[in-house]
Amino acid sequence: MIKFLSALILLLVTTAAQAERIRDLTSVQGVRQNSLIGYGLVVGLDGTGDQTTQTPFTTQTLNNMLSQLGITVPTGTNMQLKNVAAVMVTASLPPFGRQGQTIDVVVSSMGNAKSLRGGTLLMTPLKGVDSQVYALAQGNILVGGAGASAGGSSVQVNQLNGGRITNGAVIERELPSQFGVGNTLNLQLNDEDFSMAQQIADTINRVRGYGSATALDARTIQVRVPSGNSSQVRFLADIQNMHVNVTPQDAKVVINSRTGSVVMNREVTLDSCAVAQGNLSVTVNRQANVSQPDTPFGGGQTVVTPQTQIDLRQSGGSLQSVRSSASLNNVVRALNALGATPMDLMSILQSMQSAGCLRAKLEII
């Protein structure tokens, strides 16, 4: 019986205090990706490229490329091309990226091309913010969208003016790294939290000895490491696999004003309150009335007059009681009981916070 109670208590403690690895909560300062950008041409399009009369930069780029290949285009030539498109190419240079390694690239049309499906990106240099070329991109573009048009009607699924080339760029220049230099490294928390920063520092000190780690602020933990790349790699591997108990997060509600979505974490609670929500709808109907003369040869004229009707309706909302809720499930039930739409729920949550009934931070993105 005692063994059973001990196992039950251990299970409850483990469930209440969830342990996570340090590597899932932090990142090493300075070990990050770097953005690359380039300008290039896509060829081989099936008549869906730029209208060169409206995008002169496409023609200029093509002339420059042909001249580099030893082909001279006569001055004043007006090339009417439909299978070429000017594009912007973006990629991310990974940390510790080595020469010869391949990375993915994203290709996006910058002209009036209708689709990049079936196109091939010609060799495009990718530069960093220092204007140095770090990679070269080239390859066939994979477009996730689809579309068709005929007789003035068209249908489209997803985007056709952007695509991706898997392993489409080769790294030609390595980015200098400061890893392995010095005897300290900084771990950065994904979300600032004073208690979590101190808890990670205490965990490292218990395993590696007092003074091995110091919490500098709510996001940064400074760690003393041995000198040399190989020693620091082994040291960081051991630290990142350590487990810490995750403290409860701040109660937060995130509202996306563009899509109307509402997301909240499990720490959100409600106090008792009363809510009344009314709906206001405006309906506009417009019809065209056609008036024709009675006699076909009487010299009359057909007249089209628009007729507009506006209807304004307001539905009153009854006052409803919202009970105090201490768990996420109860919060969801209480809000669903109001019968409000997501857009109405955004206003209700803002009013609840102003009234002091919503125990959470409200973030609108």
Curated annotation (Swiss-Prot):
One Gene Ontology cellular component: outer membrane-bounded periplasmic space
Domain of life: Bacteria
One MF annotation (Gene Ontology) recorded for this entry: structural molecule activity
InterPro entries: Flag_FlgI
One Pfam family it belongs to: FlgI
Signal sequence extent: 1-19
Gene Ontology annotations of biological process type: bacterial-type flagellum-dependent cell motility
Subcellular location: Periplasm; Bacterial flagellum basal body
Cystine pairs: none
Record keywords, A-Z: Bacterial flagellum, Periplasm, Signal
Self-association state and partner proteins as the record states: The basal body constitutes a major portion of the flagellar organelle and consists of four rings (L,P,S, and M) mounted on a central rod.
Function comment: Assembles around the rod to form the L-ring and probably protects the motor/basal body from shearing forces during rotation.
Family (UniProt): Belongs to the FlgI family.
Protein name listed in UniProt: Flagellar P-ring protein
